[in-house]
Amino acid sequence: MNERYQLNKNLAQMLKGGVIMDVVNAKEAEIAQKAGAVAVMALERVPSDIRKAGGVARMSDPKMIKDIQSAVSIPVMAKVRIGHFVEAQVLEALSIDYIDESEVLTPADEEFHIDKHTFKVPFVCGAKNLGEALRRISEGASMIRTKGEAGTGNVVEAVRHMRTVTNEIRKVQSASKQELMTIAKEFGAPYDLILYVHENGKLPVINFAAGGIATPADAALMMQLGCDGVFVGSGIFKSSDPAKRAKAIVKATTYYNDPQIIAEVSEELGTAMDSIDVRELTGNSLYASRGW
């Protein structure tokens, strides 16, 4: 199990510095690949459409996932509901490259997340703080992402989650070794992972930004805050010129410390996706509150 998990973590490392794009069909997957995406996330509806439709959001149709797998050579990810291990079994049977146990879909289990150690395929999970990230890693997640607020086009929650994780890592790192057991209890995280953070000053897996990234500047902001890469959901294919915006976000993610390049790629991108002020969201509309 440990060898498999190490392999999965190494596989996830190969995505570092890249952009992963949500796509709903083979044509969009081809556009994403051509723009330089390191992977695509196959799903029937992007988060902004899931918000509008309401109801229960589930795993995508296997036929649609297979069509996208056939269309591109880059890795293909797909989402499952929190706790829905059978949806994960189905995706593994489809030879999916990565599974996202996602709060964007309607949770299937309000008590347990999936035991990811029972799968060969690597998992990515969302987290809004260090305790949540370490709990998911202890369950077998090979990659973490901020939760943000998907489908809003508003990066504020992704920024909040990244800053929270960074600040909590600093707290653990600066603590004395004697304090670590108390901190592990406070964060609801395993002691061995708290010890890793204390000794290394980082998560044991890569951490991507997700939720609300809509512009090249948003992507660069998250990279400058310390993310290892970015997920872009509705921000590309809900804009007026998806191909151009996709290329621009990829370039801004690569050259995130060069304002000149970010300025150049931000010119004449057309209209960004329709956005939502996160402060207007309440209750079940706040996807980041799903999971624990």
Swiss-Prot record:
Source taxon at top rank: Bacteria
Q: List, alphabetically, the Pfam families matched.
A: SOR_SNZ (PF01680)
Pathway it acts in? Answer: Cofactor biosynthesis; pyridoxal 5'-phosphate biosynthesis
Q: What is this protein called?
A: Pyridoxal 5'-phosphate synthase subunit PdxS
- Subunit composition and interactions: In the presence of PdxT, forms a dodecamer of heterodimers.
**Record-stated family:** Belongs to the PdxS/SNZ family.
**Reactions this protein catalyses:** aldehydo-D-ribose 5-phosphate + D-glyceraldehyde 3-phosphate + L-glutamine = pyridoxal 5'-phosphate + L-glutamate + phosphate + 3 H2O + H(+)
The cross-references to HAMAP family, in alphabetical order and at most eight, read: PdxS (MF_01824)
InterPro entries recorded for this chain?
Aldolase_TIM, PdxS/SNZ, PdxS/SNZ_N, RibuloseP-bd_barrel
Query: Which molecular function term from Gene Ontology is one that the record holds?
Result: pyridoxal 5'-phosphate synthase (glutamine hydrolysing) activity
List the PANTHER family. Answer: PYRIDOXAL 5'-PHOSPHATE SYNTHASE SUBUNIT SNZ1-RELATED
Q: Name one GO biological process term.
A: pyridoxine biosynthetic process
CDD domains per the record? pdxS (cd04727)
> What SUPFAM superfamilies does the record point to?
Ribulose-phoshate binding barrel
- Biological role stated in the UniProt entry: Catalyzes the formation of pyridoxal 5'-phosphate from ribose 5-phosphate (RBP), glyceraldehyde 3-phosphate (G3P) and ammonia. The ammonia is provided by the PdxT subunit. Can also use ribulose 5-phosphate and dihydroxyacetone phosphate as substrates, resulting from enzyme-catalyzed isomerization of RBP and G3P, respectively.
Q: Which UniProt keywords apply?
A: Lyase, Pyridoxal phosphate, Schiff base
Binding-site residues, D-glyceraldehyde 3-phosphate: R163
Enzyme Commission numbers on file: 4.3.3.6
| Active-site residues from the entry | K79 (schiff-base intermediate with d-ribose 5-phosphate)
| Binding of D-ribose 5-phosphate, residues | D22, G151, G212, G233, S234
User: Could you list the residue ranges that cross the membrane?
Assistant: none
